[in-house]
Every structure is written in structure tokens, then in C-alpha cells.
């Protein structure tokens, strides 16, 4: 799935302009899975939320396609009411996007696709003052976007993120911001943002100040930490401080996508009942500033269990 004179500077202009170029939501509410009525309760529908100022309506539980190339799981998620799918150019060397693209072909307007591009800035974002390096960065972003569009078999991507941003220099870089503004104007993407696996508190504070980005994707769970299942590294965050910044993001119209949602382990809402991953997701969704989440689901049974948290 982290950057004077009497006139405003170019960067200030970019930040002011960003809020006005977010695409309008394509869809009305996606039909939910309706619970069978009984004599004792009214029917319940799945939870769909608006992704910040983008106006895009997303299922509050989304499918994270970073760990599978099995199209039946994408189809299963669709069949169970999920309309938000997270992928990235880096996953399976682009094959994740190819797989998602094959499944959504013919139903593009019924789904919301979030993808990511990985770019490298060197140490702490330094070394981009050279014009040739900036040109190279621009070309890298353009090439990555075009490859994603081709793989996904679409002419637009709903949300495009910088993958794994960790410094303010990255997210505030003029070349990056100009690229995102231009591609939004051209209709190639509807919204832009970044994902961050570390240093997210600093980046959250920065994005709340600049208000340039439409969407942010950060780790979030009841435990306030995670261990990366593949790389094995550990990360934790100051939950109260992160909560404060996420509330500000909601007020600023910034859509929040949660990741590492199950890395905190199962959860018991009352401390008595057996902890479950469904309740862990429900805990996340109890916070209104979470628009949706990208959850890796390895089976149809996991999909059905996780979807229950949306009721």
C-alpha cells in the first residue's frame, strides 16, 4: 500500500489547488448484502463510507490484494459486498494489478481501485535539486502510472498512493505534487495520497497542515503496533497522538485507509467474550475517521467473517 515573497509560492499554490481537483464520486451506493428479515429485527445493510473529500463511496472493509494472485478471492469479495480493492505496482512485480484487472474488466464502475507507486529519493529525500534527477523522477512516476493503467485494464485509477513514504521531503516534493495535480486534471487518477509504514505521526501532522493529499493509508489497530509478517520488523505508534491527527484528517476532508488491521491480534469488545478478528475490525470501524481498510483475506471463509464486521 511517507515533503517568499508577496506572492504565494508554487508549493503553496499546489497545496491550495489540490482540494479543488478531487474527482467526483462515480457511483451511488453499492448494493449491500441484506440480512434476512425476522420478526424481531429490521434488515441490516453493509456499511459504506465516503472517502473524505473525494466523494468516493467505499465499503468500510476493503480487500488487500498484496498477498494473493487468486482471482476467486477478488470475486468472492465482490460477491460479499466489498467494492474497495487495494493493490500496488510492487506486489508480485505487477502481477497483483494484472490479476485485479482481469476480474474487474467489464464492471469497472462498480469497484474502487487503490494502487501505489514506489519511488526512491535517496537518503532523507536529498539530491533532487538537480534538474536531471527531477526529470528522471517525473519519468519514473509517469511510467509507473502507465504500467498500472495497462495492468488494470482501465483508463483511470481511483486512488494512487506513494508507496511507503517515510519523510516530509518525499510527500512535499514539488515534482511529486505537480505530477499528482496534472494526472488528476487529466482524469488518470481521481485522488492522490501516500501510504506510510513508519514515521506516520510526523507525516500525519504535515498532511493536516498542508491539506494537499486526498487520502492517507496508515497502520491502525487496537494494539497500536504490528510485526511485519514477511520482513519481521516491529513498529509501534503513540495511539492517542495518532488518534488526534486522524480526527483532524477527518475534519480536513482527508480519507483514511487503515492497514495492518489484524496485526494487533483478535479483540474482545467486553474483555469477557472470546477475542475475534471480526471484533478487532469492528473496533477499528468504531472510529468515524477510518473510511475503509485494506485487509488481506486468504479464503472465502475469511472474507465472510470479515464482512460481518460491516454490519
Place the predicted regions along the sequence by residue.
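Conserved, mostly hydrophobic/aromatic
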Residues: 51, 63, 85, 100, ...
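Acidic (Asp/Glu)-rich catalytic clusters
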Residues: 77-79, 101-108, 150-153, 207-211, ...
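Active-site groove signature of glycoside hydrolases
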Residues: 150-168
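Short, acidic/polar
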Residues: 68-77, 137-151, 199-206, 277-281
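Glycine-rich, proline-tolerant flexible connector loops at the mouths of alpha/beta enzymes
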Residues: 86-104, 168
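N-terminal secretory signal peptides and thylakoid transit peptides that target proteins
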Residues: 1-22
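Beta/alpha (TIM)-barrel catalytic core signal, keyed to glycine-rich beta->alpha loops juxtaposed to Asp/Glu
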Residues: 11, 93, 164-311
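C-terminal segment of N-terminal export signals and the immediately downstream linker at the start
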Residues: 29-61
Amino acid at each position: 500500500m511517507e515533503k517568499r515573497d508577496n506572492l504565494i509560492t508554487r508549493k503553496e499554490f499546489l497545496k491550495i489547488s489540490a482540494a479543488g481537483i478531487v474527482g467526483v464520486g462515480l457511483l451511488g451506493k453499492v448494493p449491500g448484502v441484506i440480512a434476512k428479515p425476522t420478526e424481531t429485527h429490521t434488515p441490516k445493510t453493509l456499511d459504506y463510507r465516503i472517502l473524505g473529500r473525494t466523494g468516493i463511496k467505499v465499503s468500510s472493509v476493503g480487500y488487500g490484494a498484496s498477498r494473493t494472485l487468486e482471482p476467486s478471492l477478488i470475486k468472492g469479495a465482490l460477491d460479499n459486498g466489498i467494492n474497495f480493492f487495494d493493490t500496488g505496482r510492487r506486489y508480485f512485480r505487477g502481477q497483483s494489478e494484472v490479476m485485479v484487472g482481469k476480474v474487474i474488466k467489464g464492471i469497472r464502475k462498480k469497484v474502487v481501485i487503490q494502487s501505489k507507486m514506489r519511488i526512491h529519493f535517496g537518503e532523507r529525500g536529498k539530491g533532487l535539486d538537480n534538474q536531471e534527477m527531477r526529470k528522471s523522477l517525473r519519468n519514473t512516476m509517469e511510467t509507473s502510472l502507465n504500467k498500472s493503467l495497462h495492468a488494470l485494464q482501465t483508463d483511470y485509477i481511483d486512488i494512487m498512493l506513494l508507496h511507503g513514504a517515510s519523510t516530509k521531503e518525499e510527500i512535499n516534493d514539488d515534482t511529486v505534487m505537480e505530477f499528482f495535480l496534472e494526472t488528476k486534471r487529466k482524469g488518470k487518477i481521481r485522488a492522490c495520497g501516500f501510504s506510510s509504514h513508519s514515521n506516520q505521526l510526523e507525516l500525519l501532522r504535515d498532511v493536516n497542515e498542508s491539506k494537499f493529499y486526498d487520502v492517507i493509508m496508515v497502520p491502525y489497530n487496537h494494539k497500536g503496533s504490528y510485526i511485519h509478517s514477511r520482513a519481521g520488523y516491529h513498529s509501534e505508534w503513540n495511539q492517542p497522538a495518532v488518534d488526534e491527527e486522524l480526527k483532524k484528517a477527518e475534519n480536513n476532508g482527508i480519507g483514511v485507509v487503515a492497514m495492518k488491521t489484524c496485526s494487533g491480534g483478535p479483540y474482545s469488545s467486553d474483555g469477557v467474550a472470546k477475542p475475534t478478528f471480526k471484533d478487532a475490525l469492528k473496533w477499528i470501524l468504531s472510529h468515524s475517521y477510518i473510511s475503509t481498510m485494506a485487509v488481506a483475506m486468504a479464503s472465502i471463509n475469511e472474507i465472510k467473517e470479515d464482512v460481518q464486521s460491516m454490519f
